[in-house]
């Protein structure tokens, strides 16, 4: 017996969340719920504004059409769907197959925002491997460089992951690097997408010795029918945001290929709700158990959805309180 429900959720965001220069006041998305043979599983479909090509409406319509096929017993062609739809539906399918472990990798790289004087004690108290993330490119590159230098200089055992979201011209990227001491640059694990083109980013890495990572470049490349990971040269790390990449099966294959190429792979969030974030933590535990995932985004929300994130004090809203967009009537 198969049954499916499609919910639409809305969650309030913290006032300071800005995506591609647009303020995000609430996060909207869908939760798909699949039931088969007495087992129920869920997945989150939430296109990321400014990053996903598909709109929320596009995703909802496609999800409903696929669910109508699924309850009739049809298989889903994952790679033919919008990435957010493929990921959310496949995650529910994956959980239904009992392929997703109960245990999750909740040791995440904390996202550093706010006053450095307040952050340093927090980072000092991190257990084990001290890895943190800093968003750069929002302010002047000199300020960013000085801040990164301060963190690395103050904590000799700290490693930083930086994300510029292609904000810099080559000149601005080099200006940033000038304010990070050469002796400290090796503790920048990677800098995601410093410049507006991959070739500029690679040139920056060669000039400065700062390792870079592909994020948007990977998202764009996987859309090509002839995509091959080995063609994405010049980096040692790929950042995988499943909502922007596609199905969980595609994510699995991408990680396996990265391993054969000697690339580091990191699973990262696309501002999923606590429900989706918990599933990403479980997926990270299964596929990359020794890698710190980039999932420290729950603090950007003002509420959680159904499944609370460990140690978060944010209020939790029930899935049943969200609107039902579609529900199957008959099933096999």
Swiss-Prot record:
The gene is menC. NCBIfam families: menC_gam_Gplu, PRK05105.1. SUPFAM superfamilies: Enolase C-terminal domain-like, Enolase N-terminal domain-like. The active site is at residues 135, 241. It comes from the Bacteria. It comes from Vibrio cholerae serotype O1 (strain ATCC 39315 / El Tor Inaba N16961). Its cofactor is a divalent metal cation. SMART domains: MR_MLE (SM00922). Pathway: Quinol/quinone metabolism; 1,4-dihydroxy-2-naphthoate biosynthesis; 1,4-dihydroxy-2-naphthoate from chorismate: step 4/7; Quinol/quinone metabolism; menaquinone biosynthesis. This is o-succinylbenzoate synthase. It is an enzyme of class 4 (lyase).
């Amino acid at each position: 017996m198969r049954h499916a429900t499609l919910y639409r959720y809305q969650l309030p965001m913290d006032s300071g969340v800005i995506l591609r220069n647009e303020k995000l006041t609430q996060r909207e998305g869908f939760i798909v719920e699949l039931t088969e043979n007495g087992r129920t599983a869920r997945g989150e479909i939430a296109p990321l504004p400014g990053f996903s090509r598909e709109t929320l409406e596009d995703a909802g319509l496609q999800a409903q059409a696929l669910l109508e096929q699924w309850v009739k017993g049809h298989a889903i062609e994952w790679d033919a769907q919008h990435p957010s739809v493929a990921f959310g539906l496949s995650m529910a399918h994956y959980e239904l197959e009992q392929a997703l472990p109960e245990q999750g990798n909740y040791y995440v790289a904390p996202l550093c925002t706010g006053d450095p004087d307040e952050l340093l004690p927090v980072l000092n108290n991190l257990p084990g491997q001290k890895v943190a993330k800093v968003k750069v490119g929002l302010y002047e590159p000199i300020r960013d460089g000085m801040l990164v230098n301060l963190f690395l200089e103050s904590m000799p055992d700290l490693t930083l992951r930086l994300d510029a979201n292609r904000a810099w011209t080559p000149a601005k990227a080099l200006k940033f690097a000038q304010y990070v001491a050469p002796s400290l640059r090796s503790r920048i694990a990677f800098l995601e997408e410093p410049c507006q083109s991959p070739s500029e980013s690679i040139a920056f890495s060669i000039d400065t010795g700062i390792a870079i990572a592909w994020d948007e470049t990977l998202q764009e490349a996987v859309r090509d029918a002839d995509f091959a990971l080995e063609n994405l040269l010049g980096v040692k790390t790929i950042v995988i945001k499943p909502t922007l990449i596609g199905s969980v099966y595609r994510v699995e294959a991408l990680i396996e290929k990265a391993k054969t190429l000697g690339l580091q792979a990191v699973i990262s969030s696309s501002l999923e709700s606590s429900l989706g974030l918990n599933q990403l933590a479980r997926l990270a535990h299964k596929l990359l158990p020794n890698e710190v995932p980039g999932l420290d985004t729950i603090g950007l929300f003002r509420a959680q959805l159904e499944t609370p994130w460990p140690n978060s004090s944010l209020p939790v809203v029930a899935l049943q309180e969200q609107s039902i967009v579609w529900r199957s009537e008959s099933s096999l």
